[in-house]
Amino acid sequence: MALPKLNTPTYELELPSTGEILKYRPFLVKEQKLLLIAQESGEEKQIANAMGELVNSCTFGKVNAKSAPMFDIEYLFLRIRGKSVGEKVKLNLICQDDGKTTVPYELNLEDVECQVQDDHSNEIQINEDIKIVFRYPLLND
C-alpha cells in the first residue's frame, strides 16, 4: 500500500518576462536540504543547479530553469522562499562611506518586484541594415 500524498498549498504569480500566470508551491524539507548542501559546498554551479531544480519542482515542471531568463528564476525563487520560510528577511547593510558600520534592515520579500520599462526591448538597431537581437542571461551562463 502506497503512502498518501500530502497536499501543499499553491499560490499564483505573474511571470515577469511573459506576464503568464503561474502556480507554485512552497519548497519541501528535502528541497531545502538540497539548498543547504549546495550552500555548504560554496560552488556557484552547484548552488545554481539546486536553485534551478527547486524552481522546476515548485512550479510543477511549468518553468524550465535551464531555458528561462535569470530574472524569472530569481523572482520565482524569492516568491517560493517567501512562502516556504517566511516573507521577512533580516539583513545587516554595510555603510558605503566607511565600509564598517552596519545597519539592521528587515526586507519583506513580497515587496520585491521585477521592474520592466515600457520601452524595453532586447533588440538594438545599429544602423538601417543591422539589428542585434539579444537573449536574456540564463541560470547556467
What are the residue ranges of the model-derived segments?
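Long C-terminal interaction/binding lobes of large macromolecular proteins
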Residues: 1-141
